[in-house]
């Protein structure tokens, strides 16, 4: 059993491994104040060959017993995930998913359970920290670490990981994920703030993200795990060249179509034509061809935004879509409004 701890935001943050879920590829107990979460990660030994995406499942659950409650009424067991649990699962998924090596298609699970809640220290941000650390100390190839913090602002002062009662009084609340070098995800809400205040809040968050990552590395160094080799990039230069030759300048023509449905139809028509043209030379490689086409579209769209400052529907980067608001859309339903 290995423990490391450090004071973060006026409370003790503790990481522990080797005591619970020892059969998992990686597991860690994260304690902050008196809030305790368990994160366990596992991965299949063999990759999926029938898919062209990474099958990652992140599941976050807040057990009733964590708050000292027993489910009452007719249903005595835990119900399906709540909206908050689903959103926290996504909040954890977003910063960790891009850090898996390209081509890694082994089914991977990240299971996060809140074991104890003190009612004040929010467990959601520690789900991402625990997932990062559990992946680090597992044999699963992953290019972390990352850390997540919550930043609040009360009376002009920034607060790291504000308590549940403090959040109600915050003018700004951000959840920020990042690595040693940069910020990779931001989510939050605020009253109207200046750009300077938002930038300062992100700098404040990143400073403490680095501090948490240092503690993650301390535990990682103590565990000394041997990682599985990263999968070799399955690059078929001949196939890429063939697809690229079929695409030509057609991509730019399609992404310049302003009507969304027309653009989608043109894209699907192009895909069908390329698959038909290449099916003899590259049989049973439909997934690979589709993946190459999607990558080419993504690259072209990003290039158009960065070089021309224009999106696919013609809007500039500082413009928003037109919106039509129809109040009292339903005559007998209170507060019904249609936004289109």
Language model feature labels by segment:
Residues 1-44, 52, 232-340:
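Extended amphipathic alpha-helical scaffolds
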Residues 3-4, 16-19, 27-28, 45-47, ...:
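A generic local secondary-structure boundary/capping motif
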Residues 14, 38, 92, 102-153, ...:
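Glycine-rich anion/phosphate-binding loop at the beta-strand->alpha-helix junction
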Residues 24-108, 114-121, 180, 187, ...:
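Glycine-rich, flexible beta-strand/loop modules in the N-terminal catalytic cores of phosphate-handling
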Residues 65-78, 116-124, 222-241, 245:
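Short, surface-exposed loop/turn segments at secondary-structure boundaries that line and modulate
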Residues 139-258:
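Mobile "lid/hinge" segments at catalytic clefts and subdomain interfaces of large enzymes
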